């Protein structure tokens, strides 16, 4: 494969917040490199060679969480599903550091972590290689002029659809009603079908759900979580 031209990608949002604790810096120094899913960045993989997911996870089915926040859900799923390999993508380094601490405490070994833009990761995921994907409480970008920054746009949904296997599940959780509107409007345009027949299908959490700190904040502030399930057609 010849070297590809790197696309221009705007990145919006924070990469780093308040100062990291000494332990968090140590986790990043000692653990992050070993949890890499492989060559994702353009500098190390300009040809955009696909990742070797069977080699990474010993042939296990692979799940993907896009924007894992503090990592509660990611570690929970890894602990509950040891026969699944899970990749988490998160550009916010404070969230990555929080996740690494949780991984140490939980002792899970079926995780890989991309500390960067999910678009770069999706570039190098093999076609039809992912069995399940999660988008949980993504940045809502509430201003109308910023809605194009949301994940549920063609720029993100097309590469996600390419990476997901037919019949695989895509879960979206959000407490923002307009994000629900845009999700239901845009996701079905890109090869997905919404699995809902009645209101309880999106009001009720999934059976294996763990409530995250983002969800708890939404509940305290009086917002209603929505749990949307799609299948890749």
UniProtKB/Swiss-Prot annotation:
Q: What is its EC number?
A: 2.1.1.33
Q: Which GO terms describe its molecular function?
A: tRNA (guanine(46)-N7)-methyltransferase activity
GO cellular component assignments: tRNA methyltransferase complex
Keywords of the record: Methyltransferase, S-adenosyl-L-methionine, Transferase, tRNA processing
Q: From the UniProt record, list the reaction(s) this protein catalyses.
A: guanosine(46) in tRNA + S-adenosyl-L-methionine = N(7)-methylguanosine(46) in tRNA + S-adenosyl-L-homocysteine
Source species, domain of life: Bacteria
**Keyword Methyltransferase attached:** yes
The entry marks the following residues as binding S-adenosyl-L-methionine, namely 65, 90, 117, 139
> What family does this belong to?
Belongs to the class I-like SAM-binding methyltransferase superfamily. TrmB family.
- Function summary: Catalyzes the formation of N(7)-methylguanine at position 46 (m7G46) in tRNA.
The record's section on PANTHER family has:
3-DEOXY-D-MANNO-OCTULOSONIC-ACID TRANSFERASE/TRNA GUANINE-N 7 - -METHYLTRANSFERASE, PENTACOTRIPEPTIDE-REPEAT REGION OF PRORP DOMAIN-CONTAINING PROTEIN
Q: What protein name does the entry list?
A: tRNA (guanine-N(7)-)-methyltransferase
The organism named in the record is: Roseobacter denitrificans (strain ATCC 33942 / OCh 114) (Erythrobacter sp. (strain OCh 114))
């Amino acid at each position: 494969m010849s070297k590809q031209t790197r696309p221009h990608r705007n990145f919006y949002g924070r990469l780093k917040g308040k100062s990291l604790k000494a332990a968090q810096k140590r986790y990043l120094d000692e653990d992050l490199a070993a949890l890499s899913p492989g060559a994702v960045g353009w500098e190390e993989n300009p040809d955009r060679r696909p990742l070797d997911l069977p080699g990474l996870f010993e042939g296990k089915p692979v799940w993907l969480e896009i924007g894992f926040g503090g990592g509660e859900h990611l570690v929970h799923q890894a602990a509950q599903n040891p026969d699944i390999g899970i990749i988490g993508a998160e550009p916010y380094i404070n969230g990555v550091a929080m996740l690494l601490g949780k991984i140490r405490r939980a002792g899970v070994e079926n995780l890989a972590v991309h500390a960067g833009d999910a678009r770069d990761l999706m570039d190098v995921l093999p076609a039809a290689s992912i069995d399940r994907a999660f988008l949980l409480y993504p940045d809502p970008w509430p201003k109308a002029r910023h809605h194009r920054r949301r994940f549920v746009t063609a720029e993100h949904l097309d590469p996600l659809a390419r990476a997901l296997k037919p019949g695989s599940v895509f879960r979206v959780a959000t407490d923002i009603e307009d994000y629900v509107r845009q999700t239901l409007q845009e996701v079905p345009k890109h090869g997905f079908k919404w699995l809902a027949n009645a209101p309880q299908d999106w009001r009720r959490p999934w059976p294996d759900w763990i409530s995250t700190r983002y969800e708890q904040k939404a509940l305290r502030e009086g917002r209603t979580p929505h749990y949307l399930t799609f299948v890749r057609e």
